[in-house]
Amino acid sequence: MGHYRCPNRAGSSDMVMTNTPPSGAMRGFGNENMSFCMEQLMDEAAEALGIDPIDIRLTNAKQVGDTAAMGLRLESTYMADCLKIGAAKFGWKERQGADRSQTGKVRRGYGLATMSHCTGAAPLYLEHSNAMVKFNEDGSVDLIVHPAPVGQHIWGALSQICAEELGIRAEDVHIIGDNTDVTLFEYGSDASRSTYAVGGATLRAARQAKAQLLSWAAEMLDVPVTDLFVKDRIVYFKNDPDKHIPISEVCFEAIYRFDGRATNFFGKQSFEPEWNSPTYGAYFAEVAVNTETGRVTVDRLVTVIDCGTPINPMAVEGQLEGAIQQEIGLALTENYLIKKETGVVETTNFDSYKVPTALDMPKIDIHIVDKPDPKGPFGAKGVGESGTVGVAPAIANAIYNAVGVRMRALPIPPERVLAALAEKNACKPDSEN
């Protein structure tokens, strides 16, 4: 319910002891399952009301100022943009009228789903990041941070954030992040928080270090500090472009001064948000369902993401493509089987636990809304888990559009599709079979 207005809700949970292996967190952390249920429910409600699935989502979408899923104020949302852009790119209006009375063994269907996923887990968890930025005598910078690099290209993003604020190149930023003896406290890389929280601390630390740099440069140039700016590793006087000084010269002068005023420019800052900026998205899927074998093939996916201003668009697309492949596996092939009598896992290798390969991937069109979040570093929000949330329900809704059966469990292997079709046909009058 994270992206829909729904004041009338309640929930309960039970703890049950089992003889099965313990479960733990993974990419998406339960949101995939909730979204699989919620987004099919939204389609069912739209069908019952006789309205377009897009319209029911737009009508009930949360707006800026509403309370986000974590209980904090929602700072930005462009879910409406995601839906409208996605519908245009996918050709939703043309495809939504697909004939349910298709003949032949292969039936085509089209479905959509929207999603939101947290950018950090405040206030449920400790949401605390720290960073230190230190200038070296050659004008390069040491960035001392400790996010967990789990494949999300976080060090690259942090280098870009730091470099952008300081007016230097990303390659001038040296990350020191693999030794807890010298780094500051860091909560960790989860809940799609690293770019947002660690990036927020990095940006604040860079601003603090830059203020010291500019103060020293103002003295060297004999101009007001408020009239200085940094670009391409040079400090400029805005009223006279010819009056400038390289960052390296300022840093060298400060470090190796012999009059008792020598110093090293650095900034050390923390980031602990008091707001929430979830990522939003819309997924549109085109599938083919073989009614004789039950096999579902995903032929095309259109993904539109509101992740604020992307720090590195290519890395964002890479994150989404990888997450989408994971989600296709969750939706169609990855079946974690446990023997009920013993609790022993039966799918112990990739010959039985089937993950999709590059050959199984559909054509994927990814579009980034690229509108800034007011609280994120340079407008960024998290995106690492967003691709794992909306794909499965979009596929399930497309299956329903193709053959008229609702899939209520994940994954959706051929045998479940055949069973659902058999149940549907058994309920028909003899004249329709």
Q: Regions from the language model: what does each represent?
A:
Residues 1-81, 88, 97-433:
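Cofactor-binding beta-sheet edge motifs in enzyme active sites
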